[in-house]
Amino acid sequence: MNKRMNELVALLNRYATEYYTSDNPSVSDSEYDRLYRELVELETAYPEQVLADSPTHRVGGKVLDGFEKYSHQYPLYSLQDAFSREELDAFDARVRKEVAHPTYICELKIDGLSISLTYEKGILVAGVTRGDGSIGENITENLKRVKDIPLTLPEELDITVRGECYMPRASFDQVNQARQENGEPEFANPRNAAAGTLRQLDTAVVAKRNLATFLYQEASPSTRDSQEKGLKYLEQLGFVVNPKRILAENIDEIWNFIQEVGQERENLPYDIDGVVIKVNDLASQEELGFTVKAPKWAVAYKFPAEEKEAQLLSVDWTVGRTGVVTPTANLTPVQLAGTTVSRATLHNVDYIAEKDIRKDDTVIVYKAGDIIPAVLRVVESKRVSEEKLDIPTNCPSCNSDLLHFEDEVALRCINPRCPAQIMEGLIHFASRDAMNITGLGPSIVEKLFAANLVKDVADIYRLQEEDFLLLEGVKEKSAAKLYQAIQASKENSAEKLLFGLGIRHVGSKASQLLLQYFHSIENLYQADSEEVASIESLGGVIAKSLQTYFAAEGSEILLRELKETGVNLDYKGQTVVADAALSGLTVVLTGKLERLKRSEAKSKLESLGAKVTGSVSKKTDLVVVGADAGSKLQKAQELGIQVRDEAWLESL
């Protein structure tokens, strides 16, 4: 029976690839169904012989307990946005300072959810959400139910690929019709529907909703030398790659493509929100490098946002964790980009003055970056009042005088004991990208603060399980889970804590770079600003901000209290060892290694202080080669770069 099951699995997987990937089926639906039923019968009779890549895994129901955290071996960066031709020209100018004659590749920006797929020996072992770029959620079982994701590859590869998982418009209409018939709330748009589907604990629901994917990148070190060749290779492996793309030599060609896509946008069977422009040559990408948050070799052009008219009813002023006071407009409700909008940001007092926004004005509302509702401008022809908005002079939280510094556009409260700032700081500290304390959201933090149970972040770690039972609406089970989540967060790697402290200009990426270099927050506390500023991708602004924070009264006490409560202050990831054998060197791995897995070789190089990259360029210091090294070895020899073999690496 095992032989026949092998035959059926191979046949059905081939037919599925023809149908979903190539759009060129070689058998009828009825023949596919007949073979599928035969396989189901055999697997029912011989469950111990079910194969890992059987297509029946895609439809079976499985109720999951939840989603585990998963550390990305290759971090996912954000893309810099562009909203105009001028911003694209500026991007091109920056690229041409480093690369003489760049060729660009333009791809559609799918409005879906970023995913990372890892295969070992050609078998799908992990499907993960983007998360914060470093840590995502393991949703492998759900992604196995997405029919166009290969469970196995035609080669026994160790490879990680990236793409977008989305819901086609036709599937979205079907899902919403079913929800309407069942009396369930409809999804606002296909992206929300895809996100909700991938968060399902019942995998049978995922299988029914017909999600789809477009893959766009090999995240693990590639043997291809361009993005275009990489996309073609992904197609050869059986992944679905969006065919709508071009190579361009200049911004004129890119702009023409953007205009063409914009005209076709509404007729596509899926949602897009822009065009991604990348430098095509991977060695040039390597040469350009990254900022703290984004690659310098790519930009995402975003289409102009949908705009609607609404009437301004009133303005709320709220204080953020850094003391900035932000105005928010209350509006007559309007439908915008698939959701009902009744509140929109007014940004700051300078923006209100610049746009001359007045009481009861009719305003144009849009979603900035297709996400945040914002007031764009006033419809002056519909103005009914000349009365200006009331601008506060005192903090709406603590009543302290508000300041408007000359070099800032916002009002600011500088009272360090301002309740709103403290509470917002606590919410930030517990958030997913910071200490990731599950369940400790804004409502619980507000109740803890109101009950005088927490005044700073160290107090969170002094809480006992019974303290939560003092809060309205919190039962024993919830209290136990909250306490356990707080205890678990003590073990986080220290970059999560550093970001959680809310130091101005120190984001999650900068926190990771700092801890990779200094190894612990205590070492960072002792460091001078010149050493911080010398770290690649950081600079003087972050160094000055850290110096100001650590010099402030109470910072040393807070760190000591956190340590005393058991919070980890050390970095648990791969550190940069200043005096290691390969410290500061840029190394490329290429070819087939005989004894080490590629991931093992990469980890060893990084432990020796090297930065491992995927392409050979003039910035490369060393190339480690295995069998069939190919074009990367040739390029290294042409550039006079030092070449070593696997035996040399093992000897270190």
UniProtKB/Swiss-Prot annotation:
Name of the protein in its database record: DNA ligase
EC number annotated for this UniProt entry: 6.5.1.2
Top-level taxonomy: Bacteria, Bacillati, Bacillota, Bacilli, Lactobacillales
Domain BRCT: from-to ranges: 577-652
PANTHER family, sorted: CHROMOSOME TRANSMISSION FIDELITY FACTOR 18 (PTHR23389), DNA LIGASE (PTHR23389:SF9)
SMART domains documented for this protein: BRCT (SM00292), HhH1 (SM00278), LIGANc (SM00532)
Binding, Zn(2+): 395, 398, 413, 418
Superkingdom of the source species: Bacteria
EC top class named in words: ligase
Cofactor annotation: Mg(2+); Mn(2+)
Record GO biological process: DNA repair; DNA replication
